[in-house]
Amino acid sequence: MLHRPLFPGTRPEETAHAPASRDLDIGRESIWISYRPISMEAFQPSLRIQFSHHRLATPVSPWERLKIGCGTPPILTRHGWLIVYHGVSEIETLNENPGKDPPTDGHQLCYSAGVMVLSKEHPQVIRYRSTKPVLTPTLPEECHGTVAHVVFPTGIDRRDDLGLPNRLDVYYGMADSRIGVARLDVPDTLPPGSVADSPEAKA
């Protein structure tokens, strides 16, 4: 199971502060992977019961420097398990729509989306990770709403029904007010220059 333990101080309604260092620590909001034996499902169906926990990824790139978290369910591709996850940074903004957008002090959290590919056999190993976001708030519907400057990936659909197994439709929240859909095409080879937290994750 992929999940993110929730730590105080980084909810959208709270003030954002950039971390003082790039040290990897438990307090950073990161993506974790947890396991449990399949044999447990017969008598304990709750996914809250896990026995093996590993930190999969922490914030690395500028667009995700405050925190990262899961997004779409993992979907199997030719390269491994693909997930579209969200990352959060802080941007300077002006309140362009008084009365419509929540008031700000000139700083705003910005939610963008990136791609991560995990090994098919060993999903705790990151094979590829976006150096830049694949989706970032640019449309008016993404920049203005209940929570401004948010794209939040949630659903994903492989279009086998159209005979296009390498086409993925990603459904995402737009400023917490609307639902959008974006197209993602799986390439023949993974792009170079992926980033990871550790040498082991680059395998």
What annotation goes with each model-predicted range?
Residues 1-66, 75-147, 160-168, 172-203:
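Beta-rich carbohydrate-recognition and catalytic domains
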